[in-house]
Structures are given as C-alpha cells and as structure tokens.
C-alpha cells in the first residue's frame, strides 16, 4: 500500500437502517405487554433475538478491524459521552478516509449517488444497553432504552425521513456497532460547524454579528425539522442546546466564513448547493384568505434563502417518541419509545418528559424553547468568552444588538404573544437562564448552557405540530406574502402563495423567472410515490402494518394471505440483503491484471494470454503481455459464500486508490460519450475522473449442480421460494438468476400494434421451457442486432449433468427449422401521410415450433416444442430450456464489444431506390424504437429513455448481469452494481474489459437495470436457511425470464 495521501474508501454502511427494522419488529410484543396479554419480562427474549443478537452479529467485522488497527479513529473532539473523530481504513492505501454511500432519489424519478464524509462517536462506557417496559399506570407499555442505543434508534427513525426526501435537516446515521468488552461506536454524517461556534464573536465565523438574519434562517430550518419529526413520530429532542445544532457549509455565495465547503451536497437526487431557496410546504391559514381565479384555495409555502448553511440536528441520545401522536397513518402505533430515566436525569430533563406526557403543546414546543433560551443566553451574556466568569460580559448586548432584536421579534411573532418575547420570557422565568455553576477548580462561574430543560409552552393551539409552521408564517409577517407561479416536476405546477423571510427574495424570484426545480429545494411533508416506492423500509413498514391488522391470532396467521404477507415483510427487509465486507482490498496481482489491459491506442478487441506469474512461457521473450487473474486467486475476504453448487465472490474496486491505468481500454474513468443515471451526458467536470467505486458480485457454478430450470413471469424471491423452499429441498443450496429481456410497456407501440398488455413480461426473441406448453417467439429481436446476439441453453433431463451453453445467434438458428416473421422500423428523416416517420418492414427468420393441436398448420411462431433443422422435434437431451440475449461482450477470448462498436454502429438497411433506373439499392438509417433521436444501435441520444430491447443504454452507467464461461466452460454469473445503489455502475465496454482479466472465453449480457439480481439460499451450520438478495434492489421486480439452479 502507498503511504502517500490516500483516496477515499466508499462503503455501504447500513447497520443503523437495519436497527429501525429490528425496532419495528418488536412493536407487536410491546403492544401485547401494554394490553396485558404478555408479561413485561417477555420482552427480554424478543429483544435478544430481534435486536441485541443481530447487532452483535453485524458488528463482528467492524470490531475485528478496529482491534487490528485496520480501521482507525482520528479523534478531534471529546465530550462527556466519549470521543468524536474521523474514520480511516488501511485498505488499498494507508489511512484512506472512509465515505458512506447514499443513494438519493428524485421526487419525480431518478437516482443520484452521494458520497458522505462520516464521523465516528466512540462511547467511553462499554456497558451493555439497558432496556425495560414501563408498568405503572402513567407509562405502561413505554419502551425505555439507554444511551447510546437510544441515539441509534432515534437516529435510525430520523434517518429514514432523511432518506424519504422530506427533510435534510437531520444528521444521517449509518452504522451502529457493539463490540464485546469494547466501546460502542456510531457512524454518522459529518456536519462541520456547531451553532455555538457559528454565533460566537469570532473573526472566522461570527455570523450573529456579520449576518444576523442567517441565525433566524437556521431557526426556520430547525423548526421545519421539528415539525417533521413530530408529525411522523410525535418526537421530542430534550437536548437541543446550541452544540447539538450544527451546520454543513455547502456554498459561500452569501456567507463567508473560514470553513471548507462541502460540495456537492446531494439531496432529492440533486446538488442543492446550487439552489437559491428552500420551500417548506405548509397549509392554508387565516392569514391567506385570497383565492385564485378558479376559487380554489392555493397552496401555501414558506420560502427562505439557501444561505450556504445547511442545518443539522444531531445527538439523539435523550429523546422520546409518542407514535400514537403521529399524523401519518403508517407510522401511527400505540407505542412510546423513551430514553431511560437515568439518562433523562443526567441532563435534568425528567420533569420535561413527564410534562410531554401530559401536554401535547408542551411536547411540541419544549425543544424549540430550550434552543431559543440557549442561543439568547449565549449572546446576551457573551458566553463565547465569559463562560466560567462570575458575571456576564457587559459588552455582549451591544455586540449582538441586531441578532438579539431579531430573536426577540421571532419569539414574539412565532408564539403570538409579547410574554413569549425572549427578553420578557426569561425575565419572568429567571431560573431558565444560564446560572453560576461549580467549576472543576472548585470555584464558581457561568455555565455555557442552561440546565433547565423544563421549558415548553402550554398553549392549546400548539397541540398540533402544524402550528409550528404557522409560527414561521407569523414570523415572516403578513406583509411578506406574494403569489407566484411555481413549476416543479411531478408535484406542483400552479400558482402558490409564499411567505418569505429575507426581504430580497421577491426580486431574486423575479430575476430567476419564478420558482422551479432549477432554483429551489422543495420540501413536502409527504414523500412522493416514487420516493416511497424506492425506499425499502417504507415497504417493510407497510407490510408489517398489514400483517398486524390482518394476522392477529394463530388461525389468521396460518392463512395463505398472512403467510404471503410475512414473506413480503422479509423480502423488503435489509436482513434479506447479502451483507458486504467493510474491508475489501485489491490484491497486487489483481491490480497488475487490471493495469495490463492494452491502451486504447492498440488494436480493437483484446486477446489475452494465460501465463505463469513468475516467468514468460518457454520459447518466448519476456513481454509486457496481459496478465490473467482468477476469482480463486482473490484474497479470502472476497469469498462470501461457498456451497455445493456455487462460490459467491464480492469484488470492490477503488480505481483511484489502486492508481488504475487511465488509458487502458475500458478504464474505469468517466468519458464524455457516456450517459449518466439521469440519461444526460456525463458532465464536463467529471470527464477524466476515476469512477468512485466499482462493485462486482460473481457466482461461479460448481460441480454439484443437478438441476437448472427456467421460469417466466416471476420475481426472483417468489421463484426462489417455490423452487428451493427454505428447509429440506435443495440441500446444497439454490441460486436464482434473472435471464434475458422481456416485453415492457414501451414495446407496445405503433410498430407492433398486435401486441397487448397480455404480452407484457413475455420474453423478447425465442424462448423455450420444456415444462411449459406455450413457447416460441412473441416478438423477434430487430435484425440489426442478430450478429451480436447469442442463445443461452441447457438441459436438466434426469440422469444428466446440468450445464449451460452459449452459441452465437446464427449457429443456434442453423440447428433449427425456421419460419418467417416480420420486424418493423421507422425510417429516419421521413414523414408518412399521418405525419409520422414511414415504417419499413423486413422479413426475418424465427425458430419453427410444433403448433398446438387446434392449429391447422405444420409449424408456427408459437407452439409446444422447437423443430430441428432435420424436421424432428427437439428432445430433452438436446436442451430443456433456451432463450436469446445479448450483446456478446467476449468471444473466443477477445473483447468484441469495443468502444468503437458501441459508439459508431448504426441501424441501417438497404432499400430499393425509387429514383434509380437500374433498381439499385440505397442505404438508409432506421430506428427500431419509435421516435428515437438517433439511429445508433448501442447508445441513445441525451435525454432518451426509450431503450426497449436492452441495447441502446450500453453507454449508460447502470446495473449489469453477465453470463460468462471460462476456458474450460465453467459458468459464471457476474453482476455489476449500479444506479448509485452502492456503486454508479459501468458501461458495457468498461465491464467487458474488466471481466476479461478473469480469463473469460465467452461473455454475454443478460437483462440489466433493476431486473438484474440473484437470490440464493443461505444455510448455516445448523441447517437454518433463508433466501438472500445479492444486490441492493428497491423494486423486487417481476421478470420475464429467470433461472433456478440447484
């Protein structure tokens, strides 16, 4: 490893999101205790089984790496709980900064990966977590948990809302680790500056003096975060002093401070650093009586500037959540989760907890009022420099004059009465001010914070969290209101009413031409359907709620419906996703193999020679020849699972850290001709940069494979359960893999009007399954692709070893009798009588099938069995299943899917030239996809999403599945993660060259995107089995074709 400055190591860290699932799974037990049907002591077994033991198991590798000093903590702060520091790993280089991978969803569809700098909190205490169930009349059924477990759980709850896209003002929590006989650790997003430091009189910061309105801007962000946490979880954060509010500095257009800018910052799938405004969705109030022209109420929003300071609420160790107060039905449960009394007493917040039980308005305001008190006291007493002094700084009120006046006005307008003006309120309640306290030296001096947490407001109108947003409207003032047109994709495209904070906002909006996705971060109280659909916990929660409502006793639990719901709960659980190693170094030999790929200046198509590592072959002079590696030669960390039928490898590549040769063919470097996840071209500032990280999953089939079967129209999860079960069957394990391409709604177009919704999920091209009566060709591949396609086929007949074969399209077709079929194209740059491009029809050959008995023909496109070239029917000993797929990536050891091919191959055909006297033909451009913007076979134009044959996104970063055969014919299924789900992905040229280093003789693409995945049967030494997904996939799609190997 190189000791020079290291590149980052990018990791999926998901033990905190898993903890949220563990917590949710305990709800039936807690409710049963609250209802009296179970004793409170019964929770201990469930806690150990569902929470504590899984946490210990998830922590094993982390604790081992920490003990071996491979993972290192670089402390930069210390508090009463322990240390805070940055986290590095000695993986491909020494001291690589560790970054967490976040996939950010756009409200209207699409993905964007985000690589987050993290910190680690290392707790001083190594005591195991404490938990109990309340049994008194006041707290019966309350689930008490100790810090740091409480911080983990509340952090997981708020992290889920961050992921949904409803609020960026929570710190994202990633990892929670419990090491036996060691300290507890939490990994979170790094926020850069404490609010206390920001508002202090300091030449590097000092925003309360230099930019006083920015303090109120931060309070607006904070109040919106409180509104969201209370609306979803009925949650109270008892320790919201000004060190537990932080900011991330995301741009310096407005505020200049001495701090590194964290850019880009991705939220809702977009870089919010470049946005001008935050828009908070609110509701109609009496202050907005005006109506639009149609007489309907207009939506009301609060608008503030994006000043560059993004607020972050941190440290959730002392909180309570009243889920029965949730305003969002799926989250509503008759359960309270609370920090233990000892932790509440530690910060003097036990009385505050009791008050939150009694009063909703108190519960909705106690954290805000505590924050306001501490900000006011910090400034009015000059505690940035007078903490520990016997008296306040007499100059502070003048130094902070403008900021104090703004705080006074904010508090009075927010709560609606002069008694809540901070100067009045704290004069009426002097005990809530910062007091003299005992110092470590034995003397007395001013504390830095108020120790009185019992600060909530009991005012009935605050019973509903929505009143917090009305408070922000009041703080803006009725004069700061305007109507404006807003245009946001998939959500708002109408006139809205906004209340704004900063006086310059109207002119800014006018200069920008209105409010839109381009200039605003739109925060809606409810996630879009798209965001919900892509969030796994959202599915898990909804299925869990469905089970709770419908499967409440032994009779209902035994029904088919309830068994299916229970299966779905596990399908959407993170526990059904194969874990990933934190430590995944690249071996030196593997790095040498990658760097031996020829440069782009050499001939297209790379041929590899296999030779020993030590010396050249006999009779040959030493050369700079390409070097093979094999999966078996990878470090032991890469082998995840070995069963009788497969070896499962995970390979993470960090191109920057291993100093990958940028000029080699298919180098993992961003190129201008490539397409990003949003169908747009790669941005200029990324061209030439290394791809952040590449992640491969590889399943090498072993000799114990007895059966390979094909199935249609199933999702992999259901198919795996049907073919393998969980116990008994498939004793050597099972592996379910997606297959080839299938008909999607985009294929139902003007070129094929005979196709209907009934044809959806039918395979594209020929397919055959001997167990099914209906086989053949429903939709042929366009002929322009035939030379690049292959057939995958095999036999599972009794008494024969199961195998997988690959033949070229022409070779396989030649083994069969064929019949005519028709494919259609649009002719480029033409216009028919209907104003649309002219259609060109071409006759192609399809495999002839034995027709159904009712058919009065000898052969047909659809039938029971294929017909051989000699006229006889295919037998099971020939093959029992087959399908068509492509493109071919590697053939006879050469990479044949090259950059030149991907970027220049066009869809062309010859037609008779009507203007020719000698019936000559002329070449024309055609499109296999209606309305295509170009005629390239393998790359769509920028912004195009119409890629209905799985070919025209070859230049796009995405998820791939490859079937490959090595030199002795052993099959490998190799997946490349993409779409930001733990990796950006690769294009097909990059992937072809990457897998060629493993010595593959043949490789062909299977269906990609979220269709690409594997489910394998994972059994432990005790015979307990469970299905696991290999790839992080939010959709769990139904597929056209899938293979089941056992």
Swiss-Prot record:
<dbReference type="InterPro" id="IPR018711">
    <property type="entry name" value="NAGPA"/>
</dbReference>
<protein>
    <recommendedName>
        <fullName>Uncharacterized protein 209R</fullName>
    </recommendedName>
</protein>
<feature type="compositionally biased region" description="Low complexity">
    <location>
        <begin position="594"/>
        <end position="615"/>
    </location>
</feature>
<feature type="region of interest" description="Disordered">
    <location>
        <begin position="594"/>
        <end position="622"/>
    </location>
</feature>
<dbReference type="Pfam" id="PF09992">
    <property type="entry name" value="NAGPA"/>
</dbReference>
